[in-house]
Amino acid sequence: VDNMVPEKQKLFQAXNGIPVHLF
């Protein structure tokens, strides 16, 4: 499941345009 976490982080980071290190 850990593999899915970084992918979502990148998606959020690209969509929001902000660094999502909290997630």
UniProtKB/Swiss-Prot annotation:
GO biological-process terms attached to the record: mitochondrial electron transport, cytochrome c to oxygen
GO-annotated molecular function: oxidoreductase activity
Membrane protein topology class: Single-pass membrane protein
Keywords tagged on the record: Membrane, Mitochondrion, Mitochondrion inner membrane, Oxidoreductase, Transmembrane, Transmembrane helix
InterPro entries cross-referenced by the UniProt entry: COX7a, Cyt_c_oxidase_su7a_sf
Stored SUPFAM superfamilies: Mitochondrial cytochrome c oxidase subunit VIIa
Pathway in which this enzyme or protein is active: Energy metabolism; oxidative phosphorylation
Pfam families: COX7a
Localization per record: Mitochondrion inner membrane
Cysteine disulfide partners in this protein: none
GO (cellular component) term, any one: respiratory chain complex IV
Function description: Component of the cytochrome c oxidase, the last enzyme in the mitochondrial electron transport chain which drives oxidative phosphorylation. The respiratory chain contains 3 multisubunit complexes succinate dehydrogenase (complex II, CII), ubiquinol-cytochrome c oxidoreductase (cytochrome b-c1 complex, complex III, CIII) and cytochrome c oxidase (complex IV, CIV), that cooperate to transfer electrons derived from NADH and succinate to molecular oxygen, creating an electrochemical gradient over the inner membrane that drives transmembrane transport and the ATP synthase.
Family: Belongs to the cytochrome c oxidase VIIa family.
Subunit architecture: Component of the cytochrome c oxidase (complex IV, CIV), a multisubunit enzyme composed of 14 subunits. The complex is composed of a catalytic core of 3 subunits MT-CO1, MT-CO2 and MT-CO3, encoded in the mitochondrial DNA, and 11 supernumerary subunits COX4I, COX5A, COX5B, COX6A, COX6B, COX6C, COX7A, COX7B, COX7C, COX8 and NDUFA4, which are encoded in the nuclear genome.
Name of this protein: Cytochrome c oxidase subunit 7A-liver, mitochondrial
Species the sequence originates in: Oncorhynchus mykiss (Rainbow trout)
